[in-house]
Amino acid sequence: MCGFLVNVPATGFTQAVWTEQGVPEHQELRAKVKAEGPKLLFSDSPEMVYETGILYRDTLQGEGRLFFHHVNGTSKLKKLAIIVKNNGLRPVNFTVTRSGIDGPSHDYQAVGKKSQEYYFEEQKSKNSTLGFGKTLELLGGEGMLLPTDQLLTGTIDFFSDRPVEVTVLMCDPKTDVELFSALAKQLPMDEHPLRGTFVKADLNYKLQHSIDTEAGAGYALLLADSQTGEYLRGTDATTGLPAENYGNYGVIYNIDYKLKGDKPYELWLNPWGGMFAGVGVLEQGGQRKIINIPESPAFGRLGEEGFCIARLEPNSEGRFTWSPPGASNLPIRLFWLPSDYEAPYLHD
């Protein structure tokens, strides 16, 4: 049984291991998927940065989102900075609508998880006006210091009423980031092609059919899997080459579901791809709840574990929102299971 009712403060949690019997018997759910939302700038290659330079750069207008994930791979202290620049003649109104940043730290999964917790929290917009040639640095105004082998990661949503150039860079601690951005060289990717610009970075899933709770069956939905064709495709703006977002990092998933019947169900998450540490948001009955997945630092070493997110009331509908966390593995599966489901090897 699940550790808490939706819309009621959590008093515990339930985690299960399914190694002997396998994951619960289930029917695969189908959903209609609509891609919309901001243009995504994805900066994760090189992940381990061994020299100073430009990590990613592109120009965009309108709704934007930046996901960055970089480790200082040098033996000396460095600085990571994000520069927004107006190269046009007319003033730009630039607004950061939402952000979640964490680090630096050696605990990469903890940083990825905490940055999502910050991102999903309620927050106020931050407005700026940039004149011709003016810049704005998004990590505290001057960049953030990054010690050796430590990670800094985050997601920043923004809106610009005119084109702006966005640059992610790493430089020495005392370097003028604005001048460096104008003169530094573009660094090549590492062996993992994880950078690019992608349109419509919100994926909205609507289950094609209501979940029939009277049948007492289990249901599952596979997400962020390389075989489903859902990984965003775009362009590496620094090279002009095609790009694919392996893992859909920086993509927001919204899953709308509806329960039909008088029996309560539970929503579970299975980290099928391996170790996972993230955050989700459950909305139901006018309430919004941020949930750590799992409550412990991470789980999923076996790929056959489950975390009970919430108990869902009969004849209810809701939305579950999540995003692939930096340093976690994919894909995942969501399970809708009867509330009297007895999970093996429970950890409370």
Regions found by a protein language model. Give the residues of each.
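Short, hydrophobic/aromatic beta-strand segments
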Residues: 79-81, 90-98, 166-169, 264-271, ...
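Terminal connector regions
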Residues: 145-182, 325-347
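Asparagine-centered strand-capping/turn motif at beta-strand->loop junctions
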Residues: 70-76, 83-94, 98, 158-160, ...
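C-terminal functional regions that serve as terminal interaction/effector modules
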Residues: 12-20, 259-348
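Intrinsically disordered, low-complexity Pro/Gly/Ser/Thr-rich segments with frequent PxxP/GP/PP motifs
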Residues: 111-147, 286-317
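Short, solvent-exposed loop/turn segments enriched in Ser/Thr/Gly
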Residues: 73-81, 150-154, 249-255, 316
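Short acidic, flexible loop segments centered on an aromatic residue
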Residues: 89-112, 266-278, 282
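A eukaryote-biased signal for short, well-structured alpha-helical docking elements
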Residues: 15-57, 191-230
